[in-house]
Amino acid sequence: MTRLTLALDVMGGDFGPSVTVPAALQALNSNSQLTLLLVGNPDTITPLLAKADFEQRSRLQIIPAQSVIASNARPSQAIRASRGSSMRVALELVKEGRAQACVSAGNTGALMGLAKLLLKPLEGIERPALVTVLPHQQKGKTVVLDLGANVDCDSTMLVQFAIMGSVLAEEVVGIPNPRVALLNIGEEEVKGLDSIRDASAVLKTISSVNYIGYLEANELLTGKTDVLVCDGFTGNVTLKTMEGVVRMFLSLLKSQGEGKKRSWWLLLLKRWLQKSLTRRFSHLNPDQYNGACLLGLRGTVIKSHGAANQRAFAVAIEQAVQAVQRQVPQRIAARLKSVYPAGFELLEDERGKKPNHR
């Protein structure tokens, strides 16, 4: 394994360095070839490195930043005032070649805008998309995008997302000839927004994409598709709803019946069932798949949940490692060159259409 360097915006997220710095040390323990650039306020970061040993410190470097982009800042305002911020400095390290990827739990809109400004989209890509890999009930994984980078998407963008998601499923997840579906309100051809139906028509003509049609939200975790494509608004709401339900379910398993008097054999049975069910469904815990890749850029950027704990942020760092090792941007660029003439030009006359649904 070759050595690689990641830039971490350790000031971003709900908990900032109190979570991101310990997560960085955890990641260093798990990967001996990893070097981390911790971008933020040195006075805040340094005390949190007190437990780091000599070997860990040799693979750490603090990069000073003057400010932090607030999580509630408007993206346009945040970008204008971003110079010297931990997020921007981390992205600039990638642009300059000092780091191979950036990980941030900060403001999503600002991260999207700055990444597009500094790293530039791949040729043939209008806007990047946030993508994650979710576990499903068949013990496999489903690639889902967009998760919030683009609230409104036209048909061209949906087709681009489908191609990028297909490459990610094949090259990173390891699914040969991955099935691709569009998220819709029904499986019938006449259902949904014009943008979805127009994208569907084009995807049917692209031989390198194994397009299977529409999928409804209640089938997200069934394993019926390997790649699920949607606009950012729908994807974000869908993902957060699913995560909320899963967290509630797992917490109920732990707390069910607490405080009530039971006979000893009922208590043993309850504990056995709780452990068994928790093991069975623990793979659905959102902490285990934290980290959405901003796909479609000339560099690698991973967006962590703002509310991520130490374990979850460490997972996001590992996502960045995998994306760099699998050369995701380069592989997407190669695939785009092969399909561009067959797909994207067919959508030129679709631009400017107003959304309509049935």
UniProtKB/Swiss-Prot annotation:
NCBIfam families reported for this sequence: plsX
Subunit structure: Homodimer. Probably interacts with PlsY.
Keyword Nucleus: no
First-listed, main subcellular location of the protein, grouped into a coarse class: cytoplasm
Keywords, comma-separated and alphabetical: Cytoplasm, Lipid biosynthesis, Lipid metabolism, Phospholipid biosynthesis, Phospholipid metabolism, Transferase
Family label: Belongs to the PlsX family.
Protein's cellular compartments: Cytoplasm
UniProt pathway annotation: Lipid metabolism; phospholipid metabolism
Family matches, as InterPro entries: FA_synthesis (IPR003664), Phospholipid_synth_PlsX-like (IPR012281)
Function: Catalyzes the reversible formation of acyl-phosphate (acyl-PO(4)) from acyl-[acyl-carrier-protein] (acyl-ACP). This enzyme utilizes acyl-ACP as fatty acyl donor, but not acyl-CoA.
Protein name: Phosphate acyltransferase
Catalytic activity, reaction form: a fatty acyl-[ACP] + phosphate = an acyl phosphate + holo-[ACP]
Gene Ontology molecular function: phosphate:acyl-[acyl carrier protein] acyltransferase activity
Coiled-coil regions listed in the entry: none
Organism expressing this protein natively: Escherichia fergusonii (strain ATCC 35469 / DSM 13698 / CCUG 18766 / IAM 14443 / JCM 21226 / LMG 7866 / NBRC 102419 / NCTC 12128 / CDC 0568-73)
GO cellular component: cytoplasm
Domain of life: Bacteria
Gene Ontology process terms (BP): fatty acid biosynthetic process; phospholipid biosynthetic process
Gene designation: plsX
Pfam family, one: FA_synthesis
Taxonomic lineage from the root: Bacteria, Pseudomonadati, Pseudomonadota, Gammaproteobacteria, Enterobacterales
E.C. number(s) listed in UniProt: 2.3.1.274
